[in-house]
Amino acid sequence: MASIKTLSTGKPVDLSIRGELSEIADSVNQASQVLSRQNQARANWISGVSHDIRTPLSMIMGYAQRIAGDHEANGNIRQEAEIIRAQSAKIKDLVQDLNLVSQLEYEMQPLHKEPVRLSKLLRSYAADLLNAGIGEKHSIGVDVSSEAETAVIECDARLISRAIGNLVQNSINHNPQGCDIFLSLDCSSEDVSITVADNGVGMSAEKLRELEEKPHYMESTDERLDLRHGLGLLLVRQIVEAHDGIMKIESTPQSGYKTILTFRWPRSLK
């Protein structure tokens, strides 16, 4: 029954059953093989499209950047070229997210796990963001509990940083009026939790429920912004689940937004 349930989620299985149920097992295995080939074909197609888009997109970004930096060009033209460059960069990020979501969903993205000290990872991310320039309307802070200061887990540091970055960018995008962003780390004897929170516009219980059900379709709580949470939040969930973790979202209108990423079995760095 567990294997059939797994198959229903879109993941292939392999049943080894003899006797009267062997024919059923064979049928399930055949269906699993077909599903596996379909998943492989879908992931390969997305990867191919992503690769084909990157080259012309890089050319567009390069030409736009050159025009935007040409001081002899008309001011309006330079401004429009900068808009093209910025929007092209967003498309490039979306293509990368789409490819990574696909690879994680079909378990085709290799995880390069190693012992990672999470307090160091959080502080390094915050420092890099501040050095790159977060903007005057937003601020970022890091809070690490004394218990979590030396907490270490086996993870892919690049992907965990990507998840944190997507959550921070989500707070920035959906709070153009400005907000404070907080990164915190805490742990217990059973798990370690990374929390990304802000004190921005938040969302209603209904919108929160919709977001949890369809994270890649959810619209912004502020209709004037015409923003969507996009693939970013879906990618965070895929990364967390690939590490056998849990993602939980908490929010209320005008009281901020919080995402908690929980991973089991932390270890202290000796």
Can you describe what each PLM-predicted range is?
Residues M1-S47, Y63-A68, G75, G230, ...:
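Membrane-proximal HAMP signal-relay module
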Residues A86-I91:
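Short alpha-helical segment of the dimerization/phosphotransfer core of two-component systems
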Residues Y106-L111, T150-C155:
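Conserved micro-motifs of the catalytic ATP-binding
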Residues H112-A127:
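A conserved beta-strand-to-alpha-helix junction within the catalytic ATP-binding
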Residues A132-V144:
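Short conserved segments within the C-terminal catalytic ATPase subdomain
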Residues S171-I172:
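Short helix-loop "hinge" at the ATP-lid/N-box region of the Bergerat-fold HATPase_c
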Residues D198:
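Acidic ATP/Mg2+-coordinating residue in the GHKL
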Residues M203-E219:
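Short conserved segment of the HATPase_c
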